[in-house]
UniProtKB/Swiss-Prot annotation:
One of its GO terms (molecular function) is magnesium ion binding. Residues 99-109 are annotated as: Flexible loop. It is an enzyme of class 2 (transferase). Belongs to the AdoMet synthase family. ATP binds at H15, D179, G180, K181, D260, R266, K267, A283, K287. GO terms for biological process: one-carbon metabolic process; S-adenosylmethionine biosynthetic process. The keyword Calcium does not apply. Catalyzes the formation of S-adenosylmethionine (AdoMet) from methionine and ATP. The overall synthetic reaction is composed of two sequential steps, AdoMet formation and the subsequent tripolyphosphate hydrolysis which occurs prior to release of AdoMet from the enzyme. Its cofactor is Mg(2+); K(+). Its EC number is 2.5.1.6. This is S-adenosylmethionine synthase. Mg(2+) binds at D17.
Length: 411
């Protein structure tokens, strides 16, 4: 049997880039909680002993950004200079400007409304008033290889990262520090199905003087085996023959912002599908939902998941594209990789009929103008069985099935 190896990685909330994502999204949530119409684009940079917060905001409220930064760092676990970073004493600089008026006018009044106001005519749908916050393309993906409709490698990598953080915070494994990464490799058969766990890599920051052999066994028992058992993979896709590598480079004492500088938006593959699907390039964290980089990608996951949940395909990838200041998408594309159970043209027609992908409609349908974003800043934005996220709902299954049946009858 011909097998191919596919790998995906995850990182913990103490990874420098994820620290930045968390800070940016904490600021976003604090603003949206007080001002649902806030326009936010916040970027964070962390380095040894210092946090920079920059970006553009338009809002009617105020939040104490330095206090939010410090609280976030302490919640993650950077609370002592002994580990190279302390949220209580680090420097925090803030350089926030106002959203560009040119961008604001295009988003507040979409091209459709501006053209209508100039030419007159019948009254337009109010959903057409909000233009896309930028041009760009977004992808959504779903597969039936896991109950959460996610690729197995990234789903397992995220579970391992979450568990690594859990055993640290609960003291189940002592001497761990916040920074960490996981990576999972599965063997796939010619039909594209995962058949065997091949390799697991866990790198975790730890206190000085820890024996790596002891740490290896702690991670095997309390992290890897725990997750495999919980996921129902032990003795199934994961027998005892897989390779486990724990801190393969040796000691990992120097981590977090002291080990590497971090930046918002640098873990876009970790945030999405672990490389199993394409990515439009736009990051999520620190962006309010008028930015289609975020809301468009969430909507595409919603679409793709409902396609697969409806039994219309085993795998689905959906692309949407927008022009800045225009409400109506400029493109929509459905790919099912030969796994479709109905003609792709019928599925695509059904998607157009069932889902309104104008930015204002997405905000309304998914109820995105609320503080739900900080919880997604680590361990993935999709397939989160531990969270109730609106884009994970399979509430359009029946409508899609009916629309596909109608489209086939009309052909």
């Amino acid at each position: 049997m011909s097998l191919r190896l596919f790998s995906s990685e995850s990182v913990t909330e103490g990874h420098p880039d994820k620290i930045c994502d968390a800070i940016s999204d904490k600021i976003l949530d604090a603003l949206i909680a007080k001002d649902p119409e806030a326009r936010v684009a916040v970027e964070t940079v962390v380095t040894t002993g210092l946090v920079h917060v920059v970006g553009e905001i338009r809002t009617t409220t105020y939040v104490e950004i330095p206090a939010l930064v410090r609280k976030t760092l302490l919640e993650i676990g950077f609370n002592s200079s002994d580990m190279g970073f302390d949220g209580s004493t680090c420097g925090v600089s803030v350089a926030i400007g106002e959203q560009s008026q040119e961008i604001a006018q295009g988003v507040d009044t979409a091209l459709e409304h501006r053209s209508h106001d100039a030419e007159g005519g019948a009254e337009l749908d109010e959903i057409d008033r909000l233009g896309a916050g930028d041009q760009g393309l977004m992808f959504g993906y779903a597969t039936n290889e896991t109950p959460e409709y996610m690729p197995l490698p990234i789903a397992l990598a995220h579970r391992l990262s979450r568990r690594l953080t859990e055993v640290r915070k609960k003291g189940i494994v002592p001497h761990l520090r916040p920074d960490g990464k996981t990576q999972v490799t599965f063997a796939y058969d010619a039909e594209g199905a995962p058949v065997r766990l091949d390799t697991v890599v866990v790198s975790t920051q730890h206190d000085a003087g820890i024996e790596q052999e002891w740490l290896h066994e702690q991670i095997r028992t309390h992290v890897v085996q725990h997750v495999l058992d919980e996921a129902g993979l032990s003795g199934n896709l994961a027998d005892t023959d897989y390779t486990l590598l724990v801190n393969p480079s040796g000691s990992f004492v120097l981590g977090g912002p002291m080990g590497d500088a971090g930046l918002t938006g640098r873990k876009i593959i970790v945030d999405t599908y672990g490389g199993m699907a394409r990515h439009g390039g736009g990051a999520f964290s620190g962006k309010d939902p008028s930015k289609v980089d975020r809301s468009g990608a969430y909507a595409m996951r919603w679409v793709a998941k409902n396609i697969v949940a409806a039994g219309l395909a085993d795998r689905a990838e959906v692309q949407v594209a927008y022009a800045i200041g225009r409400a109506t998408p400029v493109g929509l594309y459905v790919e099912t990789f030969g796994t479709e159970k109905a003609p792709v043209e019928a599925i695509q027609a059904a998607v157009r009929q069932v889902f309104d992908l104008r930015p204002a409609a997405i905000l309304q349908e998914l109820d995105l103008k609320r503080p739900i974003y900080a919880q997604t800043s680590a361990y993935g934005h999709f397939g989160r069985t531990d969270l109730d996220l609106p884009w994970e709902r399979t509430d359009r299954v029946e409508a899609l099935q009916k629309a596909v049946a109608a489209a086939q009858q009309s052909q």
